[in-house]
Structures are given as C-alpha cells and as structure tokens.
Amino acid sequence: METSSPWPPRPSPSAGLSLEARLGVDTRLWAKVLFTALYSLIFAFGTAGNALSVHVVLKARAGRPGRLRYHVLSLALSALLLLLVSMPMELYNFVWSHYPWVFGDLGCRGYYFVRELCAYATVLSVASLSAERCLAVCQPLRARRLLTPRRTRRLLSLVWVASLGLALPMAVIMGQKHEVESADGEPEPASRVCTVLVSRATLQVFIQVNVLVSFALPLALTAFLNGITVNHLMALYSQVPSASAQVSSIPSRLELLSEEGLLGFITWRKTLSLGVQASLVRHKDASQIRSLQHSAQVLRAIVAVYVICWLPYHARRLMYCYIPDDGWTNELYDFYHYFYMVTNTLFYVSSAVTPILYNAVSSSFRKLFLESLGSLCGEQHSLVPLPQEAPESTTSTYSFRLWGSPRNPSLGEIQV
C-alpha cells in the first residue's frame, strides 16, 4: 500500500523543518523528469494501442461472432481504464507534487478502487482465456460444444462483477487525512495526503489476501494451464509422420489459439489410425516447427510479462506493510521512495504491452491492427476482410486464424 507520499511519516517531526522534510519526501528533479518521460511514453503507446485494439474488435469484425474478441475487449478496456484514470493522478500527486492531495477523499478512494479493479479484471481475464485455450487444445470436440460466445460473455461478466467485489475493500481502507497538525492542534491543510486509514494489523491481512487473490493464485493457474496446453500440443505434434511417411501434409500454420485447428488435427489422427490416405496432411518441416515454437513462446511470454511487471509491485506492497515503523532507516526510506516509482512504472507497462501480445498471438489480428493503424495515419488502405473460406472439398486446406471459423468435419466423419 502507499500514500501520496510513499515514505511513511517520521515518528517525531520537528516543527522547525519544512513540511516535505517533516513528512520525509525528497524526490530529485532528475527522477521527476525521468519518470515523467517514462509515464508519457507508456500513456501514449498504451492508450493508442488499446484504443486501436478496441476499434479492431468492434469495427473490423462487426457482426461476426467469436469468443476471443470478448477476451481482447475485456483486457483492452481494463488497460484503458487504468491508464486514463490512474496514471494522470499518480503522475501529478505521487511524482511531482506529493502534498497536498488535491483530488479529495472521493478521488483518493476512487483512484485505488479503479487500480485494484483493473488489476483483478486483467489477471482474471487472462486466467479465463488460458482455461478456454487449455480446454480447446486438450478437448477440442468438447470445447466446440461447450465454449460458445454467449458463455464467454457470461464468464467475462462474472469476471468483472467479481473484480468489482474484490476491489471494493480498497475504497474503504484508503482515504484522505492530514498527517501534520499545527501548533494549536488544527490539521495543517498542506499536509493532506491519500493514505491508509486502518490499523497495521488490518492492513497486513488485507495485503496478504490481495497479493494471493490478485497475483499469486491467478498467475499460478495461468502458468499451469499454459504448461498443459503447450505439453499437449507438443505431444500431438510428435505424432506427425516424418518426411518419409506416405502422407501429404498437416496444416502449415498451427496456431495455438485455434480449437478449430486442433479439431482438424484430431480428425487427421483418427483418419490416419484407420490407414486411410490423409490427403490433407503435409510432411513435417522447419516452418511447421517454427510455428509451433512461436505459439509456445507466446504463451510463455504472457506469463513472463505479468511476472516481470507485477512481482516487484506486490513485493513493494508487502515491504511497506511488514517493515515496522522503527525499522525505517534513512537509507531504506530512500530506496523505497525510488523503488516505489519503478514498480508502479512496471505495473503500467503491463497495460501498454497487451496490444503487442495480441499481435504476437494472431497474424489475422496483426493484419487488421496494421490496416486500422494505416487508415488512421492517412494511408489509402481500407480494412480488407479476411479471405473467404474455400469451398468444401477433399483437397482444401485448413485456415488457422484467431477470428477464423474454418470448416471442420462433422462428428459422423471422424467416428472410428
């Protein structure tokens, strides 16, 4: 947890010192300039990238149902809300002007509530997406029946409702108060800060639960599910015949996020097990291996991004909570002050890089994203729809796309 002055107040401030000295805040000008530049870059790229992602989801594929579009929309809206609401307030009242807090008690509670809401919504959305992908890869036939756009909308609605409930306590334990009193016992207006209002014991319990629910458990679940997904896909791919086998081809691009592609792959396996000539299967080659490796790397990158960006943030919160008041030396105060700004910067970076992850996951999304970007930059390029699916035939190839719905054989065609 933190205040608009990230340094805990000194036990016995001297009345002869300036207010900033009495409250323990001394941010160097170089640090203010540096973090302002970093915040500005994150804000510019994050808002532009996520806003364009929302535009791509809502406009480029309007009228076409799809589940992944809802996950992308949920993550992009969460990132936009965090960047637009929290970052400007923090830059002003946490980096440049620590005292007094200028946004009022409601602004203080709202700032922390929005930040917690977006954190919960992001990590739970990523976990739900990983769960859907795991089911789609490991049980493609069942996933085709169970995973529908309507159920995905309900799941993400539940994610946001749960995030609202989990973030509400933050609006209770945080608030505005005056840290310093004048000689006549009246609160000094210039010492108004946004800080913790509850006891240390209550704060410790809250932070423990918060770190567990908003970081450790969802991230562990995401890593576990992604690990199962990668291992299962590797096992499937290992069953592809070598170049000497008398079969023609497997799909040339196997995207990890396509259960339709996995369904086609399962169909091929069943056909092959019967000794039937698999005319839709091509030999394993280097490009297919690179495609599989790319898909696995994307899933690992999603986990790595959130570990790198969020672990220091939560470690710093635990540090603030568990170091006793008499344990804060001048050196520790100084370290925490700048560590605070570094961890919050990383926290916002996680919101800015989500469009990069979308583009890494899907070449189709990347194409639409770049076309939208080009049209907004004045280039004479319209959003070209993805190629229509080829007519059904025994010689057609499968298309593996984030948004795609390639034709798959019916259950009757794959029964053994």
Swiss-Prot record:
Residues 1-32, 88-109, 177-216, 319-337 are extracellular. The keyword Ribonucleoprotein does not apply. It is found in: Cell membrane. GO terms for molecular function: G protein-coupled neurotensin receptor activity; identical protein binding; protein-containing complex binding. Residues 56-64, 132-154, 238-297, 359-416 are cytoplasmic. The keyword Phosphoprotein applies. GO terms for biological process: exploration behavior; neuropeptide signaling pathway; phospholipase C-activating G protein-coupled receptor signaling pathway; positive regulation of ERK1 and ERK2 cascade; positive regulation of MAPK cascade; regulation of membrane potential. It is a multi-pass membrane protein. Keywords: Cell membrane, Disulfide bond, G-protein coupled receptor, Lipoprotein, Membrane, Palmitate, Phosphoprotein, Receptor, Transducer, Transmembrane, Transmembrane helix. One of its GO terms (cellular component) is cell surface. A lipid is attached at residue 377 (S-palmitoyl cysteine). The modification Phosphoserine is found at residue 410. Disulfide bonds join 108-194. This is Neurotensin receptor type 2. It comes from Rattus norvegicus. The gene is Ntsr2.
